[in-house]
Amino acid sequence: MAPKDFFPPAPLDLDWDNIGIKVREVNGHVECAYNVATESWSEPQVVKGIDLTISGLSPALNYGQQAYEGMKAFRDPQGQIHIFRPEVHAARMAHSCEVVSIPPIPQAQFIRSVALAVSVNAEFVPPFDSSAALYIRPLAFGSGPQINLAQPEEYTFCVFVLPVTSLLGTKPVDALIMEEFDRTAPMGSGNAKVGGNYAPVLRWAAKARARGYGIPLHLDSKTRTEIDEFSAAGFIGVRDDDGKTTIVVPDSSCIIQSVTSDSCVQLARSYGWSVEVRPIKYTELPEFSEVLAVGTAAVIVPIGSITRDSLRDLIVYKPSEDGGYPCADKLFKSIKDIQRGLGKDVFNWCVPVHEPGAYFQPVSA
């Protein structure tokens, strides 16, 4: 049986374009446990629901020993389901785990666990012609009880899934530079996807939203002169050099390696655009014709303006005559077409998902 024949179709009674990011019940999630004695992760198991049982004295809850990822699965016009760039997410999560002293999940096991979670929840993968996707949340944490600041005896790796629409939508948003709060320290953990980099941003993001700004933008914490990233997305600047397009991506040890940004870089080169990966000075912002917020949740969102209160700066990025942002629109369409099977996957970014039985290892006698 072909994978597309195994998977049930997406339910037609759901308004897929307006499901938002509300947490809802699905068929279950996947769990693996780490064995300290054998220094290995257990085989993935499907667990019903989305709840976990965890010690109140786990280092995950007490010391923030956790790392996570964000990725997506899609359905193509033929009904096949696939995951977008899982190997890159596996590598990034392995790095994040090392930063917070969690045993890294081997790439093969990471991808197998993610694919299993998608497979058992196949009916929650939206139709290919909707604006929604199946969001995937791999999570690893120290789970064994441990009151002192030391390595626990137990670790858990889980994969949860949830159908969602885009976090920020597709219309341009206004950004506010954070000046009262630094997201990370110069030699800190800013290049890891760990909760400690995001929870402190919540109140500042809420304050920005209350003032009408859709997303905070962070400068480097050492000099406040260079662009790091948005609070929940990577930064890309677009420069028009006499008709020649150049995209500029920050090179900083304090930001995560954005999978969407990397996808944009590869696409840009395939278009014949120039690509610069280097530190970006704050003073360069007015030189850009477009600024993009890019990420798994946001995909690609054009920035309408950037405000810096201390300097009373307001940098506006005007749309073209037709109301669009040409580079953002081109990159967005290319990525979405590949993700949904509407365009040729020339980079081999999409990994097909099979029936659940394909992801369980046979038990030896």
Curated annotation (Swiss-Prot):
Q: Supply the PANTHER family for this chain.
A: AMINO ACID AMINOTRANSFERASE, BRANCHED-CHAIN-AMINO-ACID AMINOTRANSFERASE 3, CHLOROPLASTIC-RELATED
The pathway noted for it is: Secondary metabolite biosynthesis
Protein's GO biological process: branched-chain amino acid metabolic process
Enzyme class (EC, first level): transferase
The UniProt keyword set, sorted, is:
Aminotransferase, Pyridoxal phosphate, Transferase
Protein name as it appears in the record: Aminotransferase poxL
MF terms from GO for this chain are: branched-chain-amino-acid transaminase activity
**Briefly, what is this protein's role?**
Aminotransferase; part of the gene cluster that mediates the biosynthesis of oxaleimides, cytotoxic compounds containing an unusual disubstituted succinimide moiety. The first step of the pathway is provided by the HR-PKS poxF that serves in a new mode of collaborative biosynthesis with the PKS-NRPS poxE, by providing the olefin containing amino acid substrate via the synthesis of an ACP-bound dec-4-enoate.
Q: What is its EC number?
A: 2.6.1.-
What cofactors are annotated for this protein? Answer: pyridoxal 5'-phosphate
Similarity field: Belongs to the class-IV pyridoxal-phosphate-dependent aminotransferase family.
User: Induced by what?
Assistant: Expression is positively regulated by the oxaleimides biosynthesis cluster-specific transcription factor poxB.
Q: Does the keyword Transferase apply?
A: yes
Q: Which residues are pyridoxal 5'-phosphate-binding?
A: R92, E229
Q: Which Pfam families match?
A: Aminotran_4 (PF01063)
Positions of modified residues (N6-(pyridoxal phosphate)lysine): K193
